[in-house]
């Protein structure tokens, strides 16, 4: 039985999630909530500067949009509590506005009748379970939680990488740097921002800033709590990022042993290993959370290791959002079947 979903927010992640969800037979997209007219949403779904022309036909209609004959209702209400999730029988709301990334705010969707909510970003507080596929998705708990967070794109990258290294060799400590493509949190031209470096034009500079990825990692991989720290460098490219992770391991290793650990990891669809000498544009629209650049793996002093992992911070992340939504829906169905027996 397909899971009924609604998407709140039609920004970069909301639109990518919609594209991917419409290709997943386990999901039934019933509604989107956005402040733009259907003509605008249809156009931005059909034509995307980063990910190309959509392979489906999206048309604006009076009630919303139609995608290859599938009608999706367009709502436009900034207050989630007013949305008709109960009457539409919505199982999972994918919260993609970035404005409700706190359990106390996201609960408005539950109050409106949705069964569960999945945030497309790290939670800023409240009763929320953070899930990273390939790290702790086997612990997804719909009995205890109504609201879930898919963490950040960077946490989805570093999570599987750190898990493999820690499980196989043991991590003593380490530092990470994410070299991250620009996002709409930055400014095209110099303008005020609470982070004075992000106030500067994103197209002109490499911009050092903070990342919560290493800190958030402890929520999904508690074994590394207090062992990793990091920062971000925002660079003037439109998409695809990388994590540069340097760790001291408990065991002595070789480059081959490190790369083999990633190749042999049971993380199909989440983590991949690339042996060709590629650059960032080659990973555009790659669905994995992390792609190890095997040619860049280094070992010094037998146990100090440097690993580079690429990730499409839009498309890879949006694939994980859809997959976690599917898993939440399956658990809802399983629970309903048990009750019916």
From Swiss-Prot:
Pathway: Carbohydrate degradation; glycolysis; pyruvate from D-glyceraldehyde 3-phosphate: step 1/5. Transmembrane segments: none annotated. Keywords: Cytoplasm, Glycolysis, NAD, Nucleotide-binding, Oxidoreductase. Its main location: cytoplasm. The record marks 180 as: Activates thiol group during catalysis. InterPro entries: GlycerAld/Erythrose_P_DH, GlycerAld_3-P_DH_AS, GlycerAld_3-P_DH_cat, GlycerAld_3-P_DH_NAD(P)-bd, Glyceraldehyde-3-P_DH_1, NAD(P)-bd_dom_sf. This is Glyceraldehyde-3-phosphate dehydrogenase 2. It comes from Staphylococcus epidermidis (strain ATCC 12228 / FDA PCI 1200).
């Amino acid at each position: 039985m397909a899971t009924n979903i609604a998407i709140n927010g039609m920004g970069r992640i909301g639109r990518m999630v919609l594209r991917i969800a419409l290709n997943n037979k386990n999901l039934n997209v019933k509604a989107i909530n956005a402040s733009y007219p259907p003509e605008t949403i249809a156009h931005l779904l059909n034509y995307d500067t980063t990910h190309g022309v959509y392979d489906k036909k999206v048309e604006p209609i009076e009630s919303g949009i139609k995608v290859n004959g599938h009608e999706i209702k367009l709502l436009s209400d900034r207050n989630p509590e007013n949305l008709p999730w109960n009457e539409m029988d919505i199982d999972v709301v994918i919260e993609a506005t970035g404005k409700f990334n706190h359990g106390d705010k996201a609960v408005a969707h539950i109050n409106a009748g949705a069964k569960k909510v999945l945030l497309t970003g790290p939670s800023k507080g409240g009763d929320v379970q953070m899930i990273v596929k390939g790290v702790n998705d086997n612990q997804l708990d719909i009995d205890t939680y109504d609201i879930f967070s898919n963490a950040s794109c960077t946490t989805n990258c570093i999570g599987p990488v750190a898990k493999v290294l820690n499980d196989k060799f043991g991590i003593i400590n380490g530092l990470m740097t994410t070299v991250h493509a620009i996002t709409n949190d930055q400014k095209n031209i110099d303008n005020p921002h609470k982070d004075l470096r992000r106030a500067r034009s994103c197209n002109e500079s490499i911009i050092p800033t903070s990342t919560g990825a290493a800190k958030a990692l402890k929520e999904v991989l508690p074994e590394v709590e207090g062992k990793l720290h990091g920062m971000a460098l925002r660079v003037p490219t439109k998409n695809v990022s990388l994590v540069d992770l340097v760790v001291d391991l408990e065991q002595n290793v070789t480059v081959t042993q490190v790369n083999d650990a990633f190749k042999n990891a049971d993380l199909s669809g989440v983590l991949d290993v690339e042996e060709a000498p590629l650059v960032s544009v080659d990973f555009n629209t790659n669905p994995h959370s992390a792609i190890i650049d095997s040619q860049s793996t280094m070992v010094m002093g037998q146990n100090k290791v440097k690993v580079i992992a690429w990730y499409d911070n839009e498309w890879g992340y949006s694939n994980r959002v859809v997959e976690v939504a599917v898993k939440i829906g399956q658990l809802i169905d399983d629970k309903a079947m048990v009750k019916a027996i």
